[in-house]
Amino acid sequence: MGNIFSSMFDKLWGSNKELRILILGLDGAGKTTILYRLQIGEVVTTKPTIGFNVETLSYKNLKLNVWDLGGQTSIRPYWRCYYADTAAVIFVVDSTDKDRMSTASKELHLMLQEEELQDAALLVFANKQDQPGALSASEVSKELNLVELKDRSWSIVASSAIKGEGITEGLDWLIDVIKEEQL
């Protein structure tokens, strides 16, 4: 009986479980800016991530270990080293970088084929919406062929890491899905 109440309490208000979330995407998409926007609520000066940044965030009564992995071509093959025990992937796309949308789509779908990520929820940030010429979230969704993702919870959110727009809404959706499906 106690286990039933404990389980219900955890589902409603969170648990002490630590969740691993990966922030992935091509170089220059805004991954590190999003990470630190989530952690400290402001924009910090960043440089290209060679390797990774990892921060622990408390959000909605959950402890999130958020791994921001570099997106350069030479680093992407190493993403798979971080897939184990991942609850969710945040994939960040530079909505102004139309020339690399097909590369972003290829990398996204390759990654999602990995067995270790089969149960991971996916949040896509169509980032840099504050920039002229940015594709809308629905246009980015089409470019990434997100409609092909049949057996996975996913969402795409228009965002501007610099202005802080869309970040909280996206993370709220992600945490709700994780609580519903994995906790």
UniProtKB/Swiss-Prot annotation:
UniProt GO cellular component terms: cytoplasm; cytosol; endosome membrane; Golgi apparatus; phagophore assembly site; trans-Golgi network
Superkingdom as given in the UniProt entry: Eukaryota
CDD domains for this protein: Arl1
InterPro entries, sorted: P-loop_NTPase (IPR027417), Small_GTP-bd (IPR005225), Small_GTPase_ARF (IPR024156), Small_GTPase_ARF/SAR (IPR006689)
Keyword vocabulary terms for this entry: ER-Golgi transport, Golgi apparatus, GTP-binding, Lipoprotein, Myristate, Nucleotide-binding, Protein transport, Transport
A Pfam family the protein falls into: Arf
Lipidation (N-myristoyl glycine): 2
Oxidoreductase listed as a keyword: no
Protein residues bound to GTP: 25-32, 68-72, 127-130
Subcellular location(s) per record: Golgi apparatus
Subunit structure: Homodimer. Interacts with IMH1 (via GRIP domain); the interaction is dependent on GTP. Interacts with MON2.
PANTHER family found in the cross-reference section: ADP RIBOSYLATION FACTOR-RELATED (PTHR11711)
Biological role: Recruits golgins such as IMH1 to the Golgi. Can bind and hydrolyze GTP. May be involved in trafficking events within the endosomal system.
Protein name: ADP-ribosylation factor-like protein 1
Protein's organism: Saccharomyces cerevisiae (strain ATCC 204508 / S288c)
Phylogenetic lineage: Eukaryota, Fungi, Dikarya, Ascomycota, Saccharomycotina
